[in-house]
Amino acid sequence: GAVYVSGKDEVANKLSSVRALKAAKENGGKLVAVCSACYNVLKRVNNDMATDETFAYKANTYLNEGEDYHGETEVLHYLEMLRDVIGFDTIAKKVKENKENPLKGKNIGAYYGCLLLRPSKVMQFDNPEEPTIIEDFIKALGAKPVVYQMRNECCGGYVTVENKKLAQNRVEMIMSNAKTQGAEALITACPLCLYNLKENATETKLPVYYITELLAEALGIKEEEADK
């Protein structure tokens, strides 16, 4: 599920996550998510399976699929894989080979939003107040990271469905803050944030990109090549 349900009796809503985590355990023990919402749900459900015996018992009983699962899978975000498995230094070297890198010297602001960092005790993704992983990624792409106050604040999330005006106000605060600090564009790792930042921008607008889009641009990978 794309939303983590906090009620302890909401077992059924988390079974798809448990099933994915269990399958990953049986196929190498690691699960990488490109989407921050998916990452958030998988990481939190995995923690539930490891720390909440009652929930784990109910989930395993419902699934009734071979060996019980108790949170053994390591859940990673795509950014963590790029940093810790491939290495930002390796990416930076490959980027330098692209002499026509359109990102070189460009001022780009990282937008973290909520789901990558919170709840911090479970996510353990980065410093929840002063994260650096996306800024380090921006540097590896040959661009210049712009740090601004609203980068960790909520864009409105799913509230855009019921209260578009509120989401527009949130996005305006983010966009104006980033632009004031010199950002020429924003980069995010959350599809919902990407949608909100693009669709709910009103007075202040900046180009907004997904992490994989700018990675491809920096490496000189064309769209038709990426589809192969």
Segments and roles (model prediction):
Residues 1-228:
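Iron-sulfur cluster-binding electron-transfer modules in prokaryotic oxidoreductases
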